[in-house]
């Protein structure tokens, strides 16, 4: 069966670029999302997220009739599920969105269809998804029932893209293809080669699921090392940025850069999936998560110390002091605030501080609900001109373009080494 109609369930930071990539190859793509605003925006040929080069691809695809969006799934040859997989209060994976997406497409499945889970998920999630589908469609056979003879093929194929470079990496990067059977893997590989220039590397679904979790946990552990170094260096009176620069001159050392914590829907979340399934074995992974989760508290303590110094050196009351936080996104040059330590830090500062708290985030036009009423959204120039204490949280290009020599405030907490 050729892939004449492809459905992408979930039109967020991964789903929409994926839909656009298929549509750019002149395939009919139907994007499905429960967000009516997102659906209407896409059908106008516009986008509701910030991602370089995405807007032009979506605009062209919609105008040419290859891409449309809806809130209701339609019969398709292939379905890609790219919905959130957050964790619950106790760090257990929450698969409710995947379950809902799977059950929404089940009535539209036909013989020969391919269903791919892209959402980062615990090991065994693809098999669970296939069970949900089978329970709703007893008239069709699935890989866990009849193997390669299944009517519906099922696979797990995680993305590995960098926000801000998604439209390039989606096409260029290798893709792990984890089918529930060799036939499932072959069909999934056939689908991705429609736009993929990288290699399709075939394995089984459980290994593919663990591969995605491993990649993000590896990065989390390495970031934790850098963040822990920043705490140690602060106590020792050592410039952590200089230290890392010197250490990285060793030919076999490559320390990452510290920051205010770890955010985003991947690195800050996925390691907990391993910990939840392997609590006794995943001790290093758990510790890395705890180190990175603690970093925002450390930053806030540094802010409080700088505010105290500022008050001691001036005649101002705390209510007369202005604190400016630079950046809310979880990484530079994007608008994605998911699991952002910067936003959590800004919110806690605003709740604690009796004076004004400004935030500067060049990639958004309005404050998120979490900060509404707590902070004011300021321009870069206004914040630099009016704030007494500066808190650098995200190294956006706009901030790096400002020379540190021109920043005259004495009280700066720079978690990214931009101005200090």
Region roles according to the model:
Residues 1-420:
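Structural/interface elements that position substrates and couple domains in central-metabolism enzymes
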């Amino acid at each position: 069966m050729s892939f004449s109609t492809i459905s992408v369930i979930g039109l967020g930071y991964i789903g929409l670029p994926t839909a656009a990539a298929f549509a750019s190859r002149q395939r009919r793509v139907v994007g499905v999302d429960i967000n009516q605003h997102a659906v209407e925006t896409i059908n106008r040929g516009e986008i509701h997220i910030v991602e370089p080069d995405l807007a032009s691809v979506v605009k062209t695809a919609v105008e040419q009739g290859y891409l449309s969006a809806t809130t209701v799934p339609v019969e398709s040859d292939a379905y890609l599920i790219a919905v959130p997989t957050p964790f619950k209060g106790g760090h257990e994976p929450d698969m409710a969105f995947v379950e809902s997406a799977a059950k929404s497409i089940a009535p539209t499945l036909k013989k020969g269809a391919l269903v791919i889970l892209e959402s980062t998920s615990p090991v065994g999630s693809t098999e669970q998804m296939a069970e949900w589908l089978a329970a709703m469609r007893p008239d069709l056979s699935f890989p866990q029932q009849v193997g390669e003879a299944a009517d519906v093929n099922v696979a797990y194929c995680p993305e590995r893209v960098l926000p801000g470079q998604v439209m390039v990496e989606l096409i260029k990067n290798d893709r792990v293809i984890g089918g529930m059977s060799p036939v499932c893997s072959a069909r999934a590989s056939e689908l991705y080669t429609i736009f993929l220039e990288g290699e399709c590397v075939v394995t089984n679904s459980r290994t593919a699921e663990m591969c995605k979790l491993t990649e993000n946990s590896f990065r989390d552990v390495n970031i934790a090392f850098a963040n822990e170094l920043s705490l140690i260096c602060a106590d020792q009176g050592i410039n952590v940025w200089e230290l890392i620069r010197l250490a990285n001159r060793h030919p076999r050392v490559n320390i990452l850069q510290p920051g205010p914590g770890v955010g985003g829907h991947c690195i800050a979340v996925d390691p907990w999936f391993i910990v939840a399934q392997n609590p006794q074995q995943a001790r290093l992974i758990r510790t890395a998560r705890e180190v990175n989760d603690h970093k925002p508290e450390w930053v806030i303590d540094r802010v409080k110390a700088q505010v105290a110094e500022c008050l001691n050196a001036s005649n101002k009351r705390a209510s007369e002091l202005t604190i400016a936080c630079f950046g809310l996104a979880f990484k530079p040059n994007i608008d994605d605030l998911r699991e952002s330590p910067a936003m959590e830090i800004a919110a806690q500062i605003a709740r604690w501080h009796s004076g004004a708290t400004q935030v500067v985030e060049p990639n958004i036009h309005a404050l998120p609900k979490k900060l509404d009423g707590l902070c004011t959204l300021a321009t870069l120039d206004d914040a630099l001109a009016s704030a007494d204490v500066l808190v650098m949280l995200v190294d956006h290009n706009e901030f790096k373009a400002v020379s540190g020599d021109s920043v005259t405030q004495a009280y700066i907490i720079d978690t990214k080494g931009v101005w200090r």
